[in-house]
Amino acid sequence: MRRIENTAQFKRDYKRERKGLHRTTLDTELIPILNALASDEPLESRHRDHALTGDWKDHRDCHVKPDLVLIYRKPDEAVLQLVRLGSHSELGL
């Protein structure tokens, strides 16, 4: 299982989402995704996990909810780095 690292921006994004629209379901939706990513298990197709391009070329994103996106990367075999969390417009996607 990979060790999970949170960037400072992810921590701010998570705190914002915990107070916002997704406050009641954020943890119940996010924790199973994080467990699957940390264990290198495939995500369900509804999460639309895919690689990003351009400035985000070494990152991937998946949909926690239809307009709640998790950007992450796996820099090596032991680490899962959580980079951003937010809507498409907040993240500039």
Which residues fall in each region the model found?
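Basic, Lys/Arg-enriched alpha-helical interface segments
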Residues: 1-66, 75-81, 90-93
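Acidic, metal-associated active-site segment
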Residues: 72
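Residues forming the ATP-binding cleft of Hanks-type serine/threonine protein kinase domains
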Residues: 86
